[in-house]
From Swiss-Prot:
Pfam families according to UniProt: Peptidase_M17 (PF00883), Peptidase_M17_N (PF02789)
Protein name per UniProt: Probable cytosol aminopeptidase
GO molecular function: manganese ion binding; metalloaminopeptidase activity
InterPro entries documented for this protein: Leucine_aapep/pepB, Macro_dom-like, Peptidase_M17_C, Peptidase_M17_leu_NH2_pept, Peptidase_M17_N
One GO CC annotation: cytoplasm
GO biological process per UniProt: proteolysis
Matching CDD domains: Peptidase_M17
Functional note: Presumably involved in the processing and regular turnover of intracellular proteins. Catalyzes the removal of unsubstituted N-terminal amino acids from various peptides.
Catalytic activity: Release of an N-terminal amino acid, Xaa-|-Yaa-, in which Xaa is preferably Leu, but may be other amino acids including Pro although not Arg or Lys, and Yaa may be Pro. Amino acid amides and methyl esters are also readily hydrolyzed, but rates on arylamides are exceedingly low; Release of an N-terminal amino acid, preferentially leucine, but not glutamic or aspartic acids
Amino acid sequence: MIDAVKVGFVPFSTAPRGTLVVFCDDALKFGRAASKALGASAGVVKRATTTNQFKGKSAATLDILAPEGLKADRLIVVGAGKASALKGSDFLKYGGVLAGKIRGDNGAVTVIAELPSAAMSPDQSASLASGIRLRAYKFDRYKTRKKDGDDTALHANVTIAVADVAAAKKAFAPDNHVVDGIIIARDLVNEPPNVLYPEEFARRASRLRRVGVGIDILDVKAMTKLGMGALLGVGQGSARPSRTVIMRWNGGKKGEPPVAFVGKGVCFDTGGISIKSAGGMEEMKGDMGGAACVVGLMHALAARKAKVNAVGAIGLVENMPDGNAQRPGDIVTSMSGQTIEIINTDAEGRLVLADVLWYVTRKFKPKVMVDLATLTGAIMVALGTEHAGLFSNNDQLSERLTKVGIETGERVWRMPLAPEYDKLIDSQFADMKNTGGRYGGSITAAQLLQRFVDDTPWAHLDIAGTAMGAPKSDINQSWGSGFGVRLLDRLVAEYYETKR
């Protein structure tokens, strides 16, 4: 992971150094602080903005090297479009856009956080800083040689000039911890599977003790004693033993039921005996994207001292095809006592989640529970890579997730759950089977999971299309996106934190 950019805040009166970044609207007007910083170069800049195709449209950029009359070495103008059309999420995007423009810049960068009509608010300035950090991320720790044309990392010292430094720092502090959580999740998803196997994943999750998270790690012996036959069946073909990690953050009122988050952590998925085709199998190192998100989220909640009690639980396995591997036709007994016939060993994630969901439901009795999993290819057929699939037994929780998804840009789309689908996973020999056939694959997977949550308000997010390999964006150029950390942090902040 490369996160070498340093972001700080300074007053408007600070003289710009190195690269100067300013904002203008679609009328090509600048704010007072920007105009003052431009000084004698204002005429040159004005001519450039009027003769170029720039037009000041939202997120458009104009790059001018060493404009006459400007003490800075380089000027970047970022368009903010119409003031009436601005949204809160635009400032995160602008941070990403300008970080993309200064990538490879190893010097000083000064960003004037001002629109033509007014200075950016502390929250807007904080979003700008977050966007810079998120776009600056690069995972290249295993590259020993760099080629010409390789995307270069951002090593600059970025100072954001603001109207109120103290207020901007205060606004950015929690956001900065959320960005750290996203970077943790991205790192985990990007790691190769020979490095990040279940035991190593558990070890990395245990680093959250540093920010005050309580950690319990269940080994195979402990899970066997608990009766986690569904999870253990998935991992029995691997030389790497399975693990379940429980993370606890107690920031709310003592005794108040927690919010709970459960993640699928298949550290590598060959498909098992029902083996996948070779093409693209290397991407199955990312089949633990749900677990990665939960670890990143728990870091964010603890580091920003969220006023909530929260539990994160991740089931960590490898799905491998050796002589001891699970077979189609096997019947496993889950921790709940319900039996599951294995039809396809490549429908393994729901087996892992079934036991962890049941464990969390019974042990912690959460007020709400959300699981995340790169669960089905079917959700990508339905929704592509722009929305995660949302399945829930609770309308209020669904509405809240949809709302914060729009706010954060990590969008979800509600999919159906209904008793009529249950017949698709009926088994002749067990209580259910682990796959329902060709049609409605993401729905039947969620129908199975629903049987392991009792009456807990619960949502299942199928993030197969958004956690890895999703289209690059203004704030993410990484294969592993860290999807879900901002979404769920916002859910907690808006609806479940104690207001004091």
